[in-house]
């Protein structure tokens, strides 16, 4: 059986930067996922019910995105990292464990999304240059959802 890239027509040297970008994104998404779980479990205060439920929706959605990124790395001939210790070495998103109030968790989420969205835009650009429209489409889909989420969270926080 032929290798995946032979069938798709993509060139390994052209998609190598895409794989590298996706690998960094995977690390950031995994740390973000862990942070969202912590926010869900530990949120306190008057907004508990709303944010407890919202953070659960967000980490459930993010689990699917993590899987899509890891599978795309495989489709491009790479090998996705699965060790959290390695994610922490390369992730720009940092672990959080002390945030429990609505304002601090919401700020962390929007700051994190800013990092992630910048990486997704960069990956989309590199993927476009490599002729990798599938990764471009994946990143655009993520960005579309995340931009809407940022708008909704900002509207909620502006009470």
Swiss-Prot record:
EC number: 1.16.-.-
Principal subcellular localisation of the protein: cytoplasm
UniProt keyword Cytoplasm present: yes
Keywords: Cytoplasm, Iron, Metal-binding, Oxidoreductase
GO MF annotations, alphabetized: ferric iron binding; oxidoreductase activity, acting on metal ions
SUPFAM superfamilies linked: Ferritin-like
CDD domains: DPS
Gene Ontology cellular component annotations, sorted alphabetically: cytoplasm
Residues that hold Fe cation 2 according to the record: 71
Residues engaged in binding Fe cation 1: 40, 67, 71
Pfam families: Ferritin
Localization per Swiss-Prot or TrEMBL: Cytoplasm
Upregulating conditions: Constitutively expressed but is up-regulated by exposure to atomospheric oxygen in an OxyR-dependent manner.
Catalytic EC class: oxidoreductase
Physiological role: Responsible for protection of cells against peroxide, especially against hydrogen peroxide. Required for survival in host cells. Although it binds iron, it may not contribute to iron storage. The iron-loaded dps has DNA-binding activity.
Family: Belongs to the Dps family.
SUBUNIT field: Homododecamer.
The protein's name: DNA protection during starvation protein
Gene source species: Porphyromonas gingivalis (strain ATCC BAA-308 / W83)
Lineage: Bacteria, Pseudomonadati, Bacteroidota, Bacteroidia, Bacteroidales
Gene this chain is encoded by: dps
């Amino acid at each position: 059986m032929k290798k995946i890239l032979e069938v798709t027509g993509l060139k390994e040297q052209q998609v190598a930067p895409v794989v590298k970008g996706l690998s960094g994104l995977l690390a950031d998404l995994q740390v973000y996922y862990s942070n969202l779980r912590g926010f869900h479990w530990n949120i306190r205060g008057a907004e508990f019910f709303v944010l407890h439920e919202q953070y659960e929706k967000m980490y459930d959605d993010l689990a699917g995105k993590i899987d899509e990124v890891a599978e795309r790395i495989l489709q491009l001939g790479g090998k996705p990292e699965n060790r959290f210790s390695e994610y922490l070495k390369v992730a720009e998103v940092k672990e959080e464990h002390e945030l429990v109030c609505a304002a601090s968790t919401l700020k962390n989420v929007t700051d994190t999304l800013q990092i992630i969205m910048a990486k997704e835009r960069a990956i989309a650009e590199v993927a476009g240059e490599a002729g990798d429209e599938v990764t471009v489409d994946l990143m655009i889909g993520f960005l579309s959802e995340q931009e809407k989420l940022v708008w909704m969270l900002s509207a909620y926080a502006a009470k």
